[in-house]
């Protein structure tokens, strides 16, 4: 198995959220995305179908039931993180069309520079408020097999997403 690339060690400031993001190797052979000092996502570049966090595994299991095994799907991801589920879908359902929406302009480009997606991943990135983008996409006639909502909703989240 080839060695996984090592992130540059740099951080990026997320201008909308006002916090820093960084990617670091972890003790499990993957990488974690930290935003504002809190771990948000885990990625295993050597095995994108391996999902470390239980809540993401549960989401992946739901996505597994959307269509027959291996069949491509159209998925809207509200919240980008380290793009763990888009990577999973490319590994398990090659040819899937995916759209990711995130409020922080810098996040997706940073994640892609540090942890490139698997070859052939069809991913469109939209910088917008997830709620507004979902409405706009629906009004534009876009249809998806599944919508994944993975946005922080605690005190650090956007005001309209809190509790």
Model-derived regions, located:
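The AdoMet/dcAdoMet-binding core of the Class I SAM-like
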Residues: 27, 46-163
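Rossmann-like AdoMet
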Residues: 1-69, 91
